């Protein structure tokens, strides 16, 4: 898939070239080249591995991880650090200062709830999926 965003993200998972290079190295994909980012299987592998990396780095929070996937992990961490008290994930999502990221998070997580129900027959409410976001000092990680 040859889809490229205005900021340079490529493929089905819209992975940035530097992020793809980082993830490929981390998962041992020794044959990676930037041209392979256009290959759907490679793109899915890199994008899903990166999403898992940010999910782990952000304590399993789907709200923070989806925001990080779109705007970068350092921004998600900064937004969480600025909280004064724990808030519902929906409230946190509504306070994301970037319109694109705020919309992305809402779309991704509402679709995840819907398709999870379709695929498994078990629904997880959007509120449950969003959880609660508690303040936490931002700790720098190596994730791009």
What are these regions (language model features)?
Residues 1-144:
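Catalytic glycan-binding domains that act on GlcNAc-containing polysaccharides
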């Amino acid at each position: 898939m040859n889809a490229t965003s205005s900021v340079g993200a490529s493929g089905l998972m819209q992975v940035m070239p530097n992020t793809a290079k980082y993830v490929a190295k981390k998962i041992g994909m020794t044959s990676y080249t930037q041209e392979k980012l256009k290959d759907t299987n490679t793109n899915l592998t890199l994008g899903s591995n990166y999403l898992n990396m940010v999910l782990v780095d952000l304590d399993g929070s789907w709200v923070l991880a989806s925001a990080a996937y779109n705007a970068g992990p350092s921004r998600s961490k900064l937004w969480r650090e600025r909280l004064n008290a724990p808030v519902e994930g929906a409230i946190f999502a509504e306070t994301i200062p970037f319109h694109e990221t705020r919309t992305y998070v809402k779309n991704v997580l509402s679709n995840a709830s819907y398709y999870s129900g379709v695929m498994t027959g078990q629904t997880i409410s959007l509120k449950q999926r969003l959880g609660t976001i508690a303040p936490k000092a931002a700790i720098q990680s190596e994730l791009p």
